[in-house]
Amino acid sequence: MPKNEARLNRVNEELKKEISRVLTFELKNSKVTGLVSVTKAKITPDFKYAKVYVSILNSKSIGKTMEGLKESSGFIRSQVAKNINLRITPELIFELDDSLEYGAKIDSIL
């Protein structure tokens, strides 16, 4: 594994942990409802952008929750910048990860 790839993996894990913490304890957006968990974070090699994959459970309106996350991305980014020491704090792009929901659906069928 190249040195840069190992660093990317470490930063991805730190981003995942920190964004999870912010979503759990600090985010106060009324649109973000249900249980939102970060399943994966993937930062670009230039550290300018990070795709954050989230799974949303127990939410009546997944679209509204995703909209709330996108609206709050600036706040989340600022909190990440305070707690993770990076030269460039990446712009956060939230994507819905429905693999957990899909897995639960398959389990119920079996």
Where are these regions (language model features)?
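Charge-rich, low-complexity N-terminal segments
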Residues: 1-49, 55-110
